[in-house]
Structure formats: structure tokens, C-alpha cells
Curated annotation (Swiss-Prot):
Protein's UniProt name: Uncharacterized NOC2 family protein C1142.04
Xref: InterPro entries: Noc2
Modified residues (Phosphoserine): 112
Organism: Schizosaccharomyces pombe (strain 972 / ATCC 24843) (Fission yeast)
Ranges of compositional bias, category Basic and acidic residues: 18-32, 40-52
Lineage: Eukaryota, Fungi, Dikarya, Ascomycota, Taphrinomycotina
Gene Ontology CC terms, in alphabetical order: Noc1p-Noc2p complex; Noc2p-Noc3p complex; nucleolus; nucleoplasm
A GO biological-process term: ribosomal large subunit biogenesis
Record carries keyword Glycoprotein: no
Record's compositionally biased regions (Acidic residues): 692-707
Length: 707
């Protein structure tokens, strides 16, 4: 049997090579040293030792005593004793082993033709080994097939793989993610629900969230491709909740509240992953600008909220970020996704966290409503309606927060009344204050409707009286004719509240104060100003005062609100007595007024009130119960359809007409704002461009820009 010491030492060299981190090799073209993988060092070392062994076989050296070891003894491990007994041979073997490495480093500058000759020589030596020592060749076939199949194609593939690995390493030593890696992770998450893969995905997700930031310097992964970035986001957002739900399922109680089993043995292992994943979502939510990605992130994030319930710091920051998106975004899909997420958070949170969420929702709505225009009005209405739905998820928390903030509104009004000044009036005479009153009016109205549907009394009903007193106090503290638009907004809110709660609110005196104002009764001056849009105006500018445009707008608003107010009680059994003061006062005013439009509108309204009074008197005369019978009185009102009454028909027709007029006014205002925006953009382009000068603008355009 031929000598095998070189093969033995080669195997030991392979074991030592696994402990080495990098093997230095001189670059063929540039003469610099490159880092190679352990696999290359292992295969190259083994290849050189086998070549030397084949050369020894071909030279037909005489075997020594120790070389007469059989192949069976070699496989049984007896070579260890033989190897320890022949330390001299081992030392010489180590010398022989180091020699090829030195030769390899010195020969890195050889041409590709010499490498091809070496490969051909290597193949010939393997053929010679097969003929002279078939037993050992068979052993290599069974245990090291890759060594026998080592050829030029494999060399190129290995080099390509090394280059790929080196390319995947950034200059800082981080792992550069690829699409193949993302696909492999996705398969593992789908099939095995691997927690190890989950941890890797969360680490990579954190790298994506903090990309190009200081926090990303200490992270393991890095991303250099936008497609990989998007694929990673989809993977982390969609599959992480699925894997979490597989190991720790989400449960739901009868009230719809979602929770998880906190006694799960897997949950403690997932806590670092959950914390990292949560703050990564938070960072993405704060930095994203694409509406589709934000909407997707919000939709999928609600699936991990039950796992995050113990992370108070994260939940508070996440709530604030979500409320900011909900209140400030212009995209409807993002807004709806944010509402769904906040609703899930309210259903998952305990009483303390729920109060925090509702408080942030209310403050976010109040902040955004401070700037009301024709463009933001629809969004503000959506914010108020969605906030009402969130508050009514828990009546107890809703009452506590409602009591607190309604009291705050009362304190602000009290300070204005006791210390009247320009600065003290600003908080009350603001859009935030008016929209807050309207929000609580909507909430209490919706709560009253729900209590009637369920047949259970609501504790929120007790907040109606203080809210009405605050609203009437704001009207009384703001008698200025410039603030008539604000008065109309508050009266609309109170009419809405009265309609849904059934509470009688005396609003006629506040409306007739406008009728008695000199801005309505006296003759106004002509003006070319555009009609004032009362829906988006809180205060009329001084240029509108005593103008025909402003007077006509006040008359339209006054007639509308008078009809809307009295139609609330159109089916009430006491309607004939209720409208007597209004009829008398309107007729008296029409006699001394010279405003034809106002007189015509007032007399038409008076005519409808008289017809409705006659209609209700006839209906009332047909009944046999006494006014003290409250149940019969309530049933009497429910048997009459208000839309089929004389006053009801008039109000429905007027609503349709006014809606068309409002639509035209809003379109006109919107076109005007768009025109101004175009002028501003044109001015910016003119300033940036060297070819366009401001002198090219027309005088009309220049005036628009100045305005």
C-alpha cells in the first residue's frame, strides 16, 4: 500500500482551516491580497496534497513499515496511533504542507494558460491514481466525490461564488440583502414558521426602517436596492404577524376585544423581537411619504397590536404617530386605514391606555380644525365623525374625557367673560373652539340615538345641559356683527343636538337678534365682492360690513336656520303655541322694513308656520287624551311624518336649493384659490428661470400675485 501520511496531514489541515477566519491570497491582476472563504482554502489545500500524493504514487516510492497500513485500519481510525508514533514524519508532513501554500502565493501571477495546463495535469494524475491504486480511488469516490469532479468549470463557478460573496459584503462588513435572500426567508416563514428566520427578518426590517441614519451603523444588514427594500417591507409587514399568530394565537372575547395568552412559553423569547419590530414600524410610519405604503403599513400593523400591549412607551408613541397621520393626511385610503388601526387599538387597550388614545384623537382633531377652508372642510367633518365612533366604543372612558374637556371649554369661556380683552376672546372665537362644540354635540347626539336603540339610559345624557349652556354663552359673549357666521355655526350644532336628543333649546332669541341688527334692517351699499361662504368663514372681514353681499348672506342664513329650528317641533302637539311669538315678531318687522328680499322671505316663512299651526291644530282636535298624558303625547308626534307637513315640504325644498347654491359658491372659491396657486407657482418659476422675467407677467396676474 502506498504512503498515506500526506493525506492524513491534509485532513488535519482541513480541520485547522475551519478555525481560520480568512486566507490571504495575492490578486492575479492587481497584486493585492483578497479575502477568500474557508471553503476555498479547504479545497485548495486538499487539492495540493492530493496532487503531491499522486506524484508520490506515480514515482513508485517504496513504502515504509508504517505505510503498510490497510485501508480498513485507516477508516477505523487506527491512523491516530500511527500518526502519534511517527512524530518525525508528522513534522516533515507539516513542512511539506506549508510548502504548497508558499508556492501558491508566489505563483499567483502566472497566466491563465498555465492554470489550464495545471488542471489538465491534475486530471491525468487522477487517471493514474485510478490505475495504480484503485482501492484508494474508490475510497475517494465514496467520501470526497467533489475532489474527483474538480474541473475548470467548477473552478469558474467557485470563483464566481466567491466574487458574489465579496460583493455582498459592504465596506463596513455588513451583509447586503438580495432578492434571493428575501425569497428564502419567505419560504421558511410560510412552511416552517421559523423563529430563527423571524429574528433575521426583524433585524433586516430594522435596517430598512433606519436606512441612512446613525442607528443603522451598528446593524447587521444593509440594503442597496429599492426593489429589495420594497420586498423586505412586504415580507416583514405581512408575514411577521402570521408567524406570531402561529406560535401565540390571538383570541377575541364576546365584546370584540383582542388579546393573547400571556402565559405562553414562547412569548418571553419573542419580547426582544417584538420590541424591535414595533419601533421599526414606528420609524417607518414617521418617515414614509408614499400613501400606498402607509396604508399597507397601517392595515397590517393592527395584527401585531395585541402582542405590543405591554410596551407602553411604544404604544404611546405609535398612537401619536397614527393620530398625526389620521389628522394630517390628504389621502382617503390612508385616513380610513388609520381609523381602523385606532379602533383596533381602542378595543385592545386597557382603560388607562384607552383614555390616552381618545385624548390624542380629540387633540389631533382640534389641532387640524384650527385651519378651516373649502379644501379642508370635508376632512374636518370626517375627523369629527370618525372620532365620535372611536369615543363611543367605551361609554365610561367617553364620559370621563367628555366631562374633562367640556369643563375645559367652560373654563375658557368663563375667563373670556370675567376678563374681556382681545387676547382672552381669541381662544373662544376660534375654529378649534367652534369645532370642539360641534364635535361634542355630534357625540352626545349619537350616544342618545344608541341609548334609544338599546333601550338603556346613557350617562352621557348628563353632559347635554352643560354643553348647551356653554354654546349659548359663546353666542351671548360675541354680539359683534362680524361674528354672525360663528353664531350660525353654533346654532347649527345646537339644532343638530336638539334633533337627536329631543332636548328643547331656545334658539329663536339668538336668531331674532340678527334680524334686529342694523346690518340686516338698514339699507346696504352695493359691492362687487364675491358672496361670503358661511360654511368656511368664522368672522366676516371689514370689507364685507354694510355691503349688499353680506346682508343678503345674513338673510339667507337667518331664514334657513329659522325654518330648520321650527321644523324640529313640526309634529309636536304644542307647535301652534310655540310659533306664535315668531309669527308676531316677523310680521311686525316686515311692516317697517324696506328690504324687499327680507320681507318676501319672512312672509313666506310666516305663511308656512301658520299653515303648519293649522295642520297641527286639526290633528290635535281629533285626539281625546289630555296634555298631561306624556306617553300619548309622544305617540302622537311619532304618528306624523314631518316631511309630509306644510312646513316639512317647504324645508325639504329649501334644503335642495341651498345645497345647489353652496355647491356653486364652493366651486367659485375653489377656482379662485387654484388660480392664485397657479400665479404663485408661475412666480416661483419666473424667479428660478434665467429666461423668464417678472416683467412678462400681465398686470392682472401681478395683482393676483400681490393679493
Amino acid at each position: 500500500m502506498v504512503k498515506l501520511s500526506s493525506i492524513i496531514k491534509a485532513r488535519k489541515a482541513n480541520a485547522l482551516a475551519k478555525k481560520n477566519d480568512k486566507i490571504k491570497k495575492k490578486d492575479t491582476d492587481k497584486g493585492i491580497r483578497q479575502k477568500h472563504s474557508k471553503k476555498e482554502g479547504k479545497d485548495e489545500t486538499l487539492k495540493r496534497d492530493v496532487e503531491k500524493f499522486i506524484q508520490n504514487v506515480n514515482s513508485e516510492d517504496t513504502p515504509s513499515e508504517d505505510d503498510s497500513m490497510s485501508m480498513d485500519a485507516f477508516l477505523e481510525g487506527g491512523f491516530e496511533e500511527l500518526d502519534s508514533a511517527n512524530s518525525n514524519d508528522a513534522g516533515s508532513s507539516r513542512k511539506r504542507k506549508n510548502l504548497p501554500n508558499e508556492n501558491t502565493q508566489d505563483s499567483t501571477s502566472e497566466s491563465s494558460e498555465e492554470e489550464e495546463d495545471g488542471l489538465e495535469s491534475y486530471q491525468k494524475q487522477l487517471e493514474g491514481l485510478k490505475e495504480k491504486d484503485p482501492e484508494f480511488y474508490k475510497f475517494l469516490e465514496q467520501n470526497d466525490q467533489d475532489l474527483l469532479e474538480f474541473n475548470a468549470a467548477e473552478t469558474d463557478a467557485m470563483a464566481k461564488e466567491i466574487d458574489e460573496n465579496e460583493r455582498l459584503k459592504s465596506s463596513s462588513g455588513k451583509i447586503v440583502l438580495t432578492s434571493d435572500t428575501i425569497q428564502q426567508w419567505q419560504k421558511l416563514l410560510e412552511t416552517n414558521h421559523s423563529l430563527t428566520t423571524l429574528q433575521k427578518v426583524v433585524q433586516a426590517f430594522k435596517a430598512a426602517a433606519f436606512l441612512n441614519e446613525e442607528e443603522a451603523e451598528d446593524l447587521k444588514y444593509t440594503i442597496s436596492d429599492s426593489k429589495v427594500f420594497n420586498d423586505l417591507l412586504l415580507l416583514a409587514i405581512q408575514y411577521v404577524p402570521k408567524v406570531l399568530n402561529y406560535h401565540v394565537p390571538i383570541q377575541e372575547d364576546a365584546k370584540g376585544k383582542k388579546f393573547i395568552n400571556t402565559d405562553s412559553k414562547v412569548l418571553p423569547k419573542l419580547r426582544p423581537v417584538l420590541k424591535s419590530y414595533g419601533f421599526s414600524i414606528l420609524r417607518l410610519l414617521e418617515g414614509m411619504t408614499d400613501a400606498k405604503n402607509i396604508s399597507l403599513l397601517l392595515r397590517e400593523a393592527q395584527n401585531v397590536l395585541p402582542y405590543m400591549i405591554t410596551y407602553r412607551k411604544f404604544l404611546k408613541q405609535f398612537t401619536q404617530a397614527t393620530v398625526e397621520v389620521w389628522s394630517s393626511t390628504r389621502d382617503d385610503s390612508v385616513r380610513f386605514s388609520a381609523v381602523v388601526l385606532l379602533r383596533t387599538l381602542c378595543l385592545t387597550a386597557d382603560i388607562t391606555l384607552l383614555e390616552f388614545v381618545l385624548k390624542e384623537v380629540y387633540l389631533g382633531m382640534a389641532r387640524q380644525s384650527a385651519y378651516t377652508t373649502v379644501h379642508t372642510l370635508d376632512k374636518i367633518n370626517f375627523l369629527k365623525n370618525s372620532a365620535v365612533n372611536l369615543f363611543l366604543l367605551d361609554a365610561e372612558s367617553c364620559y370621563l374625557i367628555g366631562f374633562r374637556y367640556i369643563r375645559q371649554l367652560a373654563i375658557t369661556l368663563r375667563n373670556t367673560i370675567h376678563q374681556p380683552s382681545k387676547d382672552s376672546r381669541k381662544p373662544v372665537q376660534s375654529w378649534s373652539y367652534v369645532h370642539s362644540l360641534d364635535f361634542w354635540a355630534r357625540l352626545l347626539s349619537q350616544a342618545a340615538w344608541l341609548s334609544r336603540e338599546k333601550g338603556v339610559a346613557s350617562e352621557l345624557q348628563s353632559l347635554v345641559y352643560p354643553l348647551v349652556q356653554i354654546a349659548l354663552g359663546v353666542i351671548m359673549s360675541s354680539p359683534s356683527s362680524q361674528l354672525f357666521p360663528m353664531r350660525f355655526h353654533i346654532i347649527r350644532s345646537l339644532i343638530y343636538l336638539s334633533r337627536h336628543t329631543g332636548v328643547f333649546i331656545p334658539l329663536a332669541p339668538s336668531l331674532f337678534e340678527v334680524l334686529d341688527s342694523s346690518y340686516v334692517s338698514r339699507k346696504a351699499k352695493a359691492s362687487t365682492l364675491k358672496p361670503l361662504d358661511f360654511d368656511v368663514e368664522l368672522r366676516a372681514s371689514s370689507s364685507y360690513l354694510r355691503t349688499k353681499v353680506y346682508q343678503d348672506g345674513l338673510i339667507d342664513q337667518l331664514l334657513e336656520l329659522l325654518s330648520e329650528y321650527y321644523v324640529l317641533y313640526a309634529t309636536d302637539i304644542s307647535f301652534p303655541e310655540l310659533v306664535i311669538p315668531a309669527i308676531v315678531r316677523s310680521k311686525r318687522f316686515a311692516k317697517r322694513s324696506k328690504n324687499a328680499k327680507l320681507n318676501r322671505g319672512l312672509l313666506t316663512l310666516v305663511n308656512r308656520l301658520e299653515q303648519q299651526s293649522k295642520f297641527m291644530t286639526e290633528k290635535r282636535n281629533q285626539q281625546k287624551f289630555a296634555p298631561i298624558d306624556s306617553d300619548s303625547v309622544e305617540q302622537f308626534a311619532q304618528t306624523i311624518d314631518w316631511q309630509q307637513t306644510p312646513l316639512g315640504i317647504y324645508v325639504v325644498t329649501q334644503r335642495q336649493t341651498r345645497e345647489e347654491q353652496r355647491k356653486l359658491i364652493r366651486e367659485s372659491v375653489q377656482q379662485d384659490q387654484e388660480h392664485k396657486e397657479q400665479m404663485r407657482q408661475k412666480k416661483k418659476q419666473a424667479l428660478k428661470s434665467d429666461d423668464i422675467e417678472l416683467d412678462d407677467l400681465s398686470e392682472e396676474e401681478a395683482e393676483d400675485i400681490d393679493e
